[in-house]
A protein has these predicted regions:
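C-terminal catalytic core of tyrosine-transesterase DNA break-rejoin enzymes
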Residues: 133, 137, 225-247, 254
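Conserved tyrosine-mediated DNA breakage-rejoining catalytic core shared by Y-recombinases
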Residues: 147-184
Length: 274
């Protein structure tokens, strides 16, 4: 997140304890920061954790014009907090139990066309070019791109691969173009080092990539492009799922667009002939 949301005093101690349990469970730093941001934003419109009711939470959600995925993220966050709050005996009920569940949106693949990616590469800096290639040619998430390190490059039987540390600290190995792998190895540490220490944040990567693409396209659409191209070449959805770091093939289906060549073939088959 660009700014750290200030936590109301009435919530601070309990939220800190809850976040500690997430860290203890192995959630990534990015996930913990995201949960903190969301709970801080919500509780600024609510009384204390003990006084908050389900109706009040529902009114907060009704007052915001959030996209479905954003709304779902906020609901999951406050539901997770109150589930912990109830299970640890801090309160005798869970006020989120009657908060309406968010309807799961019908997601569709959104692969960025290669022509836009090539245009972006043409005006990108060296660092931005590497960010774009890691998303479009290796299928990495923003947070994964931010954390790429020279130590992550390894030799496989056919060339170079990249060890990727994904959500929940799960690791996977993805093929990496030799020239890109050489650039990563040459950096001698984080490919995108932070200003003071560590590496840049996911939001930094996302902003740089989105700035170079036309409106409506983002770093995530490059990941969709990777999934679509890989499936078109292999016809192996399970393989694509593993390369993307998904725990479910069902999730991968959202990323894979039907190849245009097959759609055109279908159109040709039904076109009326004079």
């Amino acid at each position: 997140m660009a700014k750290k949301m200030i936590m109301p005093v009435a919530w601070a101690q309990d939220v800190d304890c809850w976040l500690e349990t997430l860290k203890a469970a192995g959630f990534s730093d990015d996930t913990v920061r995201s949960r903190r941001y969301k709970i801080a934003r919500l509780c600024r419109e609510l009384p204390s954790p003990m006084e908050t009711t389900g109706e009040q939470i529902t009114r907060v959600f009704a007052a915001h014009d959030w996209k479905p995925e954003t709304r779902k993220g906020y609901r999951n966050t406050i539901a997770g907090f109150y589930r912990w709050f109830y299970e640890t005996g801090r309160r005798g009920d869970n006020p989120t139990a009657k908060v309406p569940k968010v309807k799961k949106p019908q997601a569709h693949p959104h692969p960025c066309p290669d022509k836009y990616i090539l245009m972006a590469l043409g005006k990108a800096t060296e660092d931005e070019r590497r960010m774009i290639r890691l998303a479009a040619e290796c299928g990495l998430r923003r947070s994964e791109i931010a954390a790429v390190n020279s130590d992550d490059v390894m030799d496989d039987l056919l060339g170079k691969s990249l060890i990727v540390r994904g959500k929940g600290d799960k690791q996977r190995i993805v093929p990496c173009p030799d020239d890109l792998a050489a650039e990563i190895q040459a950096c001698g540490g984080y490919l995108f080092p932070g200003r003071w220490s560590g590496h840049v944040e996911a939001s930094y990567v996302g902003k740089h990539i989105t700035r170079l693409l036309p409106d409506g396209w983002s770093a995530h659409s490059l990941r969709h492009r990777y999934a679509t191209r890989t499936y078109e070449s292999t016809h192996d959805l399970y393989l694509v799922s593993k390369l993307l770091g998904h725990s479910s093939v069902e999730t991968t289906q959202i990323y894979v667009a039907m190849p245009d060549s097959r759609l055109r073939a279908g159109m040709s088959a039904v076109t009326l002939q004079a």
